[in-house]
A protein has these predicted regions:
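RNA-binding accessory domains that recognize and position tRNA/RNA substrates
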Residues: 1-204, 208-209, 223, 336, ...
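Hydrophobic beta-strand scaffold residues
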Residues: 106-107, 194, 243, 261, ...
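Active-site glycine-centered loops adjacent to acidic/histidine catalytic or metal-binding residues
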Residues: 112, 247, 290, 332
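Residues that mark the start of a beta-strand
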Residues: 169-173, 193, 242, 285, ...
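Cysteine-nucleophile active-site neighborhood
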Residues: 213, 218-285, 293, 338-353
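Catalytic beta-strand/loop cores that center a nucleophilic Ser/Cys/Thr
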Residues: 282-323, 357
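A glycine-centered loop/beta-turn motif at secondary-structure junctions
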Residues: 318-356
Length: 357
């Protein structure tokens, strides 16, 4: 069956329908990872977005549920150049097309994803529609595309109940704004007992549990939409408990302490982004997935100073908080998919908790 990807600038790509045949409107973004498509699909940070994979062949090793970063896929839609319909992998349990159908997610194959990516890089991230309706009306569709917003998506992806990953070491409170499983697993593998809390949990509840450390997770959407959460993060900042924040959590901490964030032209999404440690000068290759960034010009150096920056575009990739046991990063040290270069940051967090005892 034919499918169409329609961008808000009027560009139309024709391809073949994969997954569900329902019609969706979403923010179109691109990911440059060559592998790890299942981890991308199950990353809650993609809620409210349709993902274009720039690598030309997707699906060749199938679906291995053990590798999922959450229980289900989160993107509104999926865009690929060529879909491998016969995966070759002894671990494979399903195909991408079946996986998308199961969760009612529409996709389109046969799209010139390099051309699409060039458009998004030149004009910036834009909204789009995936449809199987060949009689589409651009005059009717384009105003709808321009009016679309992702809105408050954290509440859609956070856990509904508190749950615990047992451990014999430090006790960490993880606020789930759309956390990838490997954040909690990275702590648990280091012996930590990790208690995962819903995003709307009050700071008082977190602090009453007397954790050794607090982790603020990744998540989807515009951080400025999380007004209630930002107020609670401010209370956590004022405590003396060590805090480590990743991605959206990094942005929320910045907003909670008086800095500002801004939307990027097309964001960073992939497993090959170089970041520089500004203290040592060392460069690490990182996994990233964000469309917003902390505006370093709005930082108060008495509160926080840049700790990492992106080598390519010099945007902020991390902050160190003055006089506090708090550090935050924009990238993903848990990787999955991506390199493990910055996994040492979890060890730094453990050391911080140990010293704070």
């Amino acid at each position: 069956m034919k499918a169409f990807l329609i961008l808000e600038d009027g560009t139309v790509f024709e391809g073949t329908s994969i997954g569900s045949t329902k019609e969706i409107i979403s923010e179109i973004v691109f990911n440059t990872s060559m592998t790890g498509y299942l981890e991308v699909l199950t990353d809650p940070s993609y809620a409210g977005q349709a993902v274009c994979m720039t690598y030309p062949l997707i699906g060749n090793y199938g679906i291995c549920h053990e590798d999922q970063e959450s229980l289900k896929p989160w993107p509104d839609g999926y865009i690929v150049r060529e879909l491998s319909r016969i995966p070759s992998n002894f671990r494979s349990e399903d195909t991408i097309q079946n996986f998308l159908k199961k969760y009612d997610i529409p996709g389109i194959a046969g799209v010139d994803t390099r051309a699409l990516t060039r458009i998004l890089r030149k004009k910036g991230t834009m909204n789009g529609m995936i449809t199987t309706n060949a009689a589409y009306n651009l005059e009717e569709i384009l105003p709808r595309l321009k009016a679309y917003t992702t809105g408050k998506v954290v509440e859609k992806v956070t856990c509904t109940e508190t749950h615990v990953l047992e451990g014999n070491g430090k006790r960490v409170a993880l606020l789930d704004f759309g956390a990838k499983d490997n954040i909690a697993q990275s702590l648990n593998r280091r012996g930590c007992e990790v208690t995962v809390y819903p995003a709307a949990t009050s700071a008082e509840t977190i602090l009453a549990s007397d954790p050794d450390g607090i982790m603020l997770s990744n998540g989807p959407g515009d951080p400025k939409e999380c007004t209630a959460i930002i107020k609670e993060v401010r209370k956590l900042y004022e405590s003396e408990i060590p805090i480590f924040a990743i991605c959206l959590g990094h942005q929320l901490m910045a907003l909670a302490t008086g800095a500002d964030t801004k939307k990027m032209k097309y964001g960073h999404r992939g497993g090959n982004h170089p970041v520089k440690d500004l203290e040592t000068g060392r460069v690490y290759i990182s996994s990233q997935n964000h469309g917003y960034v902390v505006d370093t010009e709005t930082l108060n150096p008495e509160v926080a100073v840049p700790a990492f920056e992106n080598v390519n575009d010099k945007t902020n990739e991390g902050l160190k908080y003055t006089g506090k046991n708090i550090f935050t990063v924009q990238f993903h040290p848990e990787a999955c998919p991506g390199p493990q270069d910055s996994g040492y940051l979890f060890d730094r967090f453990l050391e911080m908790m140990e010293v704070n005892q």
